[in-house]
Amino acid sequence: MEINEVIREIKSKFRLFMNGVISQSLREKGLQYRLIFGIELPRIKEIAAQYEPNHELAQALWKEDIRECKILAAYLQPVESFYPEIADIWMEQIHNTELADYVCMALFRRLPYASQKAFQWMASENRMEVYMGFRLMTHLFALLGAEMNERSRDEFIDQATAAMRSDDLIVKQAALSALERYASCGEEQSAEVQHLLDAGA
């Protein structure tokens, strides 16, 4: 089946599960897409399970200005063909925290260069990149623990400290979440974070 035919088939499945109430609620929360079907994540994952991971299909889905297509793309994108420059392109096109969270969970945390991207984005001046950087660190701490060299640890703490002093609530919350996950990795990390918070970060 051609990619365009597969996408038409996927959209027909989306229409079956369309939820107008959720769609309207998401728009009221500020999500801006050409189309929002209002389908919840478990159902999108069920649809994803019906297809083999496919780079061309995932890239075509990502180009659609449709919420569910972009989320599905993250589940169907093979890791091995998702190069760092493509990750940067996707990151530039993520404009809300919902999509950032889903893409991070489904794809970015599995990338072999995930930690490099996390540090790159945490140091960005773009708020959504900073948010993604901390969300990615949260996932990496959960998956891999707090194994970092001293330089990386110091950089993470410095970036988190700066973010905690930010007036941007989403950045601050993402940094706090990453710090909490880091603290859960061991007594040393817990004490380090507690000292940071006590100091008024």
Locations of the language-model features?
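Alpha-helical scaffold domains
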Residues: M1-A201
